[in-house]
C-alpha cells in the first residue's frame, strides 16, 4: 500500500566533482522492511547513503527522493535527521574535547527542538542515556569519554548504535557498519539494530559481506553496480553473491 512507503527513490543520479557516481537508482522501502545494498568497491553504495543524508559535496543531477511523502532533496541535512533519518558511518569521526554525554544531550535536544518539543530535563536525559547504554552493552564510564577518542573499531561502532538508540530514527542507514568488527562486536551491533527495529521503521544495510546479514536478516537484497541497481531479490541473493561473486550475477 502507498501509505506504507517510507522512502521512494526514482531515477536518482548524483555526482561528485563532476564525476557521475549514481546513474539512475530506483528503490522503494516500506515500513518494517530491512533492505541490504551490496556491491563491489566503487559501485556507489556509500554515495547513495551520503546523498540520502544530504552531504553537501554530492550533487544530485536528476531524479526524486521522497521520505514519508516529503521531498527529501529539498531538506537540509538537519531537517532530514529531524524527520527521522540516521546515518551510521563507515569510519566514525573523533571529536576531541566533547564528551559523549554532552554530544548526545545536544543531539537529542536538537531533534526535539526540530519537532517543536521542549528539551529533556537533566534527570530524564540521564535516565534515558543509562537505559540505552545498557541496551547496547556499553559501560557507563564511556559517558565521560570524548567522542570516539581512543576507541577501538568495535567501540566506535557500538557508540554509533547507542546514538541510534538515543535518536530513535524511522529510517536507519548503516554504511558498512561491520567494517573492522570482530565476531563478538558484530553480534552486539547487530543485536542492537535488530532490537531497535519495529514494524513502523526501516533500515538500509550497506555491506560487502554476508556475515553481517547472517545476524541482520534482510527482507530485500539489492546489488548496486556501476551506479545502478542491477539485481533485486530476497535474502537468498546473499548466498548467490557469496557463491558467484558480483561479475557472474
For every predicted segment, state its role.
Residues 35-37, 49:
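Short hydrophobic beta-strand immediately N-terminal to the Walker A/P-loop
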Residues 220, 224, 228-249:
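Conserved beta-strand-loop-alpha-helix hinge in the C-terminal portion
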Residues 173-177, 184:
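Walker B catalytic motif
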Residues 7-9, 22-24:
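Conserved structural motif at the start of ABC-family nucleotide-binding domains
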Residues 64-80, 148:
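ABC ATPase NBD Q-loop/coupling interface
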Residues 38-43:
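The feature captures the beta-strand-to-loop junction immediately N-terminal to the Walker
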Amino acid at each position: 500500500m502507498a501509505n506504507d512507503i517510507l522512502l521512494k527513490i526514482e531515477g536518482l543520479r548524483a555526482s561528485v566533482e563532476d564525476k557521475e557516481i549514481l546513474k539512475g537508482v530506483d528503490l522503494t522501502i516500506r515500513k518494517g522492511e530491512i533492505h541490504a545494498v551490496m556491491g563491489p568497491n566503487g559501485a556507489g553504495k556509500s554515495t547513495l547513503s551520503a546523498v540520502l543524508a544530504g552531504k553537501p559535496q554530492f550533487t544530485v543531477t536528476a531524479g526524486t527522493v521522497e521520505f514519508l511523502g516529503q521531498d527529501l532533496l529539498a531538506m537540509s541535512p538537519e531537517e532530514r535527521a529531524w524527520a527521522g533519518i540516521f546515518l551510521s558511518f563507515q569510519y566514525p569521526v573523533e571529536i576531541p574535547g566533547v564528551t559523549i554525554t554532552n554530544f548526545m544531550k545536544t543531539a537529542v535536544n536538537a531533534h526535539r527542538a526540530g519537532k517543536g518539543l521542549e528539551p529533556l530535563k537533566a534527570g530524564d536525559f540521564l535516565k534515558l542515556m543509562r537505559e540505552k547504554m545498557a541496551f547496547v552493552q556499553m559501560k557507563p564510564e564511556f559517558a565521560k569519554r570524548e567522542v570516539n577518542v581512543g576507541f577501538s573499531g568495535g567501540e566506535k561502532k557500538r557508540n554509533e548504535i547507542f546514538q541510534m538508540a538515543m535518536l530513535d530514527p524511522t529510517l536507519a542507514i548503516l554504511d558498512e557498519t561491520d567494517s573492522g568488527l570482530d565476531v563478538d562486536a558484530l553480534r552486539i551491533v547487530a543485536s542492537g539494530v535488530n532490537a531497535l527495529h519495529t514494524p513502523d521503521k526501516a533500515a538500509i544495510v550497506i555491506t560487502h559481506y554476508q556475515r553481517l546479514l547472517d545476524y541482520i536478516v534482510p527482507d530485500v537484497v539489492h546489488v548496486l553496480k556501476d551506479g545502478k541497481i542491477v539485481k533485486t531479490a530476497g535474502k537468498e541473493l546473499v548466498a548467490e553473491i557469496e557463491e558467484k561473486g558480483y561479475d557472474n550475477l
